[in-house]
Amino acid sequence: YGEARTAQDSVMLEKTFEEGMQVFPDSAFFLNNLINTYIYSNRNEKALEMLNVAIQKNPNDANLYNVMGRVYETGLKDYANAEKNFQIALEKDPNLTDALSNIGRIYYNQGVNKLSEANMINDSKKYQEELSMAKDLFKKALPYYKKAHEAEPEKMDNMIALRGIYYNLNMGPELEAIEAEMNK
């Protein structure tokens, strides 16, 4: 392992993790590192395959579902499956802050996209409909980001998202409060 790691030989490293899994099938070390190797090399289908193996071995590990959600979100751009896996992660651990902010980000980004679409519409009625859908998505993201922020009050990403949500939902006092927090 050390030799492969030092040489940064990803092929050898991957082979080492695969062999380690065969020799130590109950050890999460080799499986988790193999999953990370697949993720960082953008082999998302292989990462999902190994994540499913890991979940079979440890079905109550919320982090595995969270990682699976990230693979779906960032690697495959499959937001429905990303959301589903983030929800499962939160069912397993309602306080998993990464999953809270990840699912919040799914809704927030959808809201931003919907807002951009709305801004391209000239018809007032259609604009209002799209704007309403965008606001609903921001409202959906809000509780996840609030809970993540409560758990990790120093995390700037959560504060930036909350600022955007408060701004888009015309929540003046909350916007002022989060901006004051950000400027500490």
Question: For each predicted feature, which ranges?
Answer:
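Canonical positions in the second alpha-helix
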Residues: 20, 53-54, 88-89, 148, ...
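Short coil/linker segments at helix-helix boundaries
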Residues: 109-144
